[in-house]
Amino acid sequence: MYRPAARIFVVVLAALMAAPLCAQNHPRTDALPPIGSVTPVEVPSPEQVFAIPPAMRAMLQAQVIDRSSSREQRLQALVEMIFGRQGLDLQYDANATYTVDEVWQQRRANCLAFTLMFVALAREAGIQARVQEVGQVVSWYQDQDAGVVYSVGHVNAGVEIAGRYATVDLDRNVLYDRHGPQPVSRARALAHFYNNRGAERMAEGDLVGARAFFDASVVQDRAFPSVWNNLGVLDNREGNTDAARQALDRALRLDGRQDAALTNASALYRQLGLDAQAKALERRLKSVQREDPFAQYMLGTQAEQAGKLAEAIRYYRQAVRLYDTAHQFHFGLARAYFLAGQLKRADRELLRAQALGGAPQQARYQAKLDSLARWRAQQQARR
């Protein structure tokens, strides 16, 4: 069974824990805006993405660097500067894929923008910091109208203090895959930035802007599977099915287990009437998902929402078997058991979820089940 390595989170970040992950909640894309409303394409250079504005550098000097020569104390001071009211007073915004300068101006950031800013400021303060990539979390979103999956990815920051390593993430409850956060190059970090911006533009219907950012992502890292998936979606949306097929094929050559590319490629083959190829990809997708605890959990959630509790229980149990230390999975199973009237099993899974989640999760999970109990009693009273 997979047991993730311990992660260190800066306690001050707890103020943002109610915010979602970097999964993006973009506007509907069923109707493209008129050409005249499309924002001109201004792709910031790599230097502009990381550039610290003078006023922010002055704040860093006063609130972090001048306060202590200790790297550990500077790290804590940096977090206080970023989230404190006397500093940036940073707010979470899932759609704020900003440069460091834009974060300074807007005082908002998503996971990616926060990470790039944090690493830039930490290095300026003499703290060893790096951008880290998490291969699999809930880092893609579904456009229900268009029926496609966009890849955006998840990143966080890693720091080293006196030989100890810590991860700084906007969500301390984020569930990482088997590999956990992996350090990435500056080029890959920039590829994430441009890819995110491109996904945002595409969701807004600005296909010209989307392509400009996706192209910039490819320039930084041609081996980044997510951007090829997104280029495939964009090419298909523009009616260039040959280019879409090439882009999606390239995404799958780079990562043959990527759900988004498998989903989009199989849909494209169906669209082209290539049913045999589509079926082959669908079989591969199902095979990947059977051994993927994240996919099993999401399938369980979908089944639960559809009222298919036996199916939901089956998916949740598989997720737990594959990743037995994830308190979220145990709570999903507890919830499904409870709704199905299997109360003893629900209690068992709830206790497991509370034990794994620790004190912060215990009251929250109990409150959720208490709410479900009231709802269930109301439903039974109406019968």
What are the residue ranges of the model-derived segments?
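Structural marker of alpha-solenoid helical repeat scaffolds
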Residues: Q220, L254, S287-V288, R321-Y323, ...
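Long, contiguous interaction/recruitment modules in multidomain scaffold/adaptor proteins
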Residues: Q91-W228, V233, R237, D242-G256, ...
